[in-house]
């Protein structure tokens, strides 16, 4: 009969009850974890005290050969008791934490259903007050849990988001159809922006991949000095953003552009100038850069130095002079031949 005459509770009172139960369950989880650590600490300390008393008693009572056997037995027994007690204590507290986390998940799901019910049934002002009260609490708890540094949105954006939540389809259609008026200043600013700033306006730096290093990797890093602990970070001088890492030998000679602000950070030192060397010669006088070697060059020069067949006056005069010289050289040879014959 009580169910027939019972009045339905309002969503606001139900949300308050669920929020209180969620806070209670979170506090209970914290107390369970702290009590787990405290119990293990007191358990270990009590075993150490009992073991030290037992070792002193055996040292004073038993003789030399029996003393060592009893001490070894006590040590083995203490190790077994420690492991068994630790297993039992951790199992008990893990069961308690699983039970409370199950209740917490049920309470959170109930809270989300109640918030959806508030959005559907209540008026705009009442629903907005309830959502601002309970959704803010949920957002703050998630931020504290994840240790994130996110900025809260402005009140104007929050009001527009809440109004869009309760808007009808016709209102949403009108909102889409009416374009936002952009002034000339915004157009000029977008034109004056460089492509780098247009590309990196909403850029988020990539989180580095953290690999799990084994003992062998740590030994190699210690001897080779090639791990992340042996590198220098590239920090921007303007916005102090991390832009990667480099080896200590390359660090003074590296210039880089910042990922966040686009500032060009020059190198601290100028690198050593490497002298230009001539590429080595390959087979058949061909160099590695595709040029022709000295053997073919000399061949071409010899071909260019062949006697010319031009019939110019200078060439004919040179030819006549050469002919007269050859005749003068031939005359004494004939005279010598005649004298020898006679």
Curated annotation (Swiss-Prot):
It comes from the Eukaryota. Residues 179-191, 295-321 have a biased composition (Polar residues). Keywords: Coiled coil, Developmental protein, Endoplasmic reticulum, Membrane, Metal-binding, Transmembrane, Transmembrane helix, Zinc, Zinc-finger. InterPro entries: Lnp, Lunapark_Znf. This is Endoplasmic reticulum junction formation protein lunapark-1. Residues 61-68 are lumenal. GO terms for cellular component: endoplasmic reticulum membrane; endoplasmic reticulum tubular network; membrane; neuron projection; neuronal cell body; synaptic vesicle. It is a multi-pass membrane protein. Disruption phenotype: Worms exhibit increased resistance to aldicarb indicative of an affect on neurotransmission but equal sensitivity to levamisole which specifically inhibits the postsynapse. Mutants also show mislocalized rab-3 and snb-1 proteins. One of its GO terms (molecular function) is zinc ion binding. It is found in: Endoplasmic reticulum membrane. It holds the Pfam family Zn_ribbon_10. Residues 1-39, 90-342 are cytoplasmic. Residues 322-342 have a biased composition (Basic and acidic residues). Residues 13-34, 102-136 form a coiled coil. PANTHER family: ENDOPLASMIC RETICULUM JUNCTION FORMATION PROTEIN LUNAPARK (PTHR22166:SF12). Disulfide bonds: none annotated. Residues 161-191, 278-342 are annotated as: Disordered. Expressed in cell bodies along the ventral cord around the pharynx and the tail both in larvae and adults. Also expressed in muscles and hypodermal cells. Its main location: endoplasmic reticulum. The chain crosses the membrane at residues 40-60, 69-89. It comes from Caenorhabditis elegans. GO terms for biological process: chemical synaptic transmission; endoplasmic reticulum tubular network organization; locomotory behavior; regulation of egg-laying behavior; regulation of protein localization; regulation of synapse structure or activity; synapse assembly; synaptic vesicle transport. A zinc finger (C4-type) spans 236-261.
């Amino acid at each position: 009969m009580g169910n027939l005459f019972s009045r339905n509770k309002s969503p606001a009172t139900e949300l308050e009850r669920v929020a209180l139960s969620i806070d209670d369950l979170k506090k209970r989880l914290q107390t369970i974890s702290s009590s787990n650590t405290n119990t293990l600490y007191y358990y270990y300390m009590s075993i150490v005290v009992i073991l030290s008393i037992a070792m002193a008693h055996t040292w004073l009572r038993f003789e030399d050969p029996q003393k060592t056997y009893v001490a070894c037995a006590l040590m083995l027994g203490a190790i077994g008791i420690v492991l068994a007690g630790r297993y039992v204590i951790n199992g008990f507290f893990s069961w308690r934490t699983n039970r409370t986390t199950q209740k917490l998940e049920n309470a959170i799901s109930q809270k989300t259903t109640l918030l959806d019910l508030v959005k559907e049934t209540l008026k705009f002002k009442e629903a907005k007050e309830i959502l601002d009260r309970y959704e803010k609490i949920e957002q703050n708890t998630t931020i504290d849990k994840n240790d994130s540094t996110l900025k809260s949105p402005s009140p104007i954006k929050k009001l527009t988001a809440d109004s869009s939540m309760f808007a009808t389809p016709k209102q949403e259609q009108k909102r889409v159809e009416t374009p936002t008026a952009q002034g000339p200043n915004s157009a000029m600013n977008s034109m004056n922006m460089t492509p780098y700033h247009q590309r990196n306006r909403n850029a988020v730096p990539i989180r580095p991949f953290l690999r799990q290093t084994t003992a062998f990797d740590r030994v190699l890093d210690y001897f080779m000095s090639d791990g992340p602990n042996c590198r220098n970070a590239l920090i921007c001088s303007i916005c102090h953003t991390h832009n990667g890492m480099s080896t200590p030998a390359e660090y003074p000679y590296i210039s880089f552009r910042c990922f966040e602000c686009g500032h060009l950070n020059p190198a601290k030192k100028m690198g050593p100038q490497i002298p230009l060397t001539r590429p080595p010669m390959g087979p058949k006088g061909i160099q590695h850069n595709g040029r022709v070697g000295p053997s073919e060059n000399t061949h071409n020069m010899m071909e260019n130095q062949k006697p010319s067949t031009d019939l110019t006056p200078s060439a004919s005069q040179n030819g006549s002079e050469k002919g007269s010289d050859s005749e003068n050289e031939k005359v004494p040879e004939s005279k010598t031949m005649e004298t020898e014959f006679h």
